[in-house]
């Protein structure tokens, strides 16, 4: 892959194109119909118990729309149950029996993924996850749009 002239966005997409298929294949190897994007939802529900979509989106750092789409897929695939909340417009999500049964295999795979990430970190000489967290924090303090406006045009 020749990324000599790639810019930040292209490099970030290329990185995800390297990571996501490998993780998806690991789940297929376990005979699980599971997507990496389900992980933050499952982990949050494991930690907090049943949640409204709004609260889950906030906890996962996703937009309400993105979380709603992911949750719909997870309900369809049998990973979550959705119930109507106190307000008939809100849905309360909780882990399904399928999710609870698969947790040991998923947790083992999450640990393997973390070990693989540490191997990458060792090759890089720094934690990629920490670099990404730091970048997101910096952008939270001063968004990229502001940085673009502050950069002189030549």
Question: Could you say what each language-model-derived stretch is?
Answer:
Residues 21-63:
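N-terminal helix-turn-helix DNA-binding core of bacterial DNA-binding proteins
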Residues 16, 43-47, 107:
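Short, locally clustered residues in the helix-turn-helix/winged-helix DNA-binding domain
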Residues 72-130:
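Charged, amphipathic alpha-helical coiled-coil/dimerization segments
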Residues 1, 123-154:
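C-terminal regulatory/oligomerization modules of transcriptional regulators
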Residues 1-32, 139:
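N-terminal leader segment of winged-helix/HTH proteins
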């Amino acid at each position: 892959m020749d990324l000599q002239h790639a810019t930040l966005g292209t490099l970030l997409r290329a990185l995800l194109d390297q990571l996501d298929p490998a993780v998806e294949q690991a789940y297929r190897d376990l005979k699980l119909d599971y997507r990496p994007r389900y992980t933050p939802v499952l982990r949050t529900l494991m930690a907090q118990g049943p949640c409204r979509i709004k609260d889950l989106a906030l906890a996962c750092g996703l937009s309400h729309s993105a979380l709603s789409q992911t949750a719909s897929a997870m309900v369809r695939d049998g990973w979550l149950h959705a119930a109507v909340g106190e307000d008939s417009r809100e849905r309360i999500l909780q882990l399904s029996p399928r999710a609870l049964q698969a947790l040991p295999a998923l947790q083992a795979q999450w640990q393997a993924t973390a070990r693989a990430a540490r191997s990458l970190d060792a090759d890089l000489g720094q934690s990629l996850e920490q670099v990404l967290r730091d970048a997101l924090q910096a952008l939270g303090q001063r968004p990229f749009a502001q940085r673009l406006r502050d950069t002189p045009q030549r």
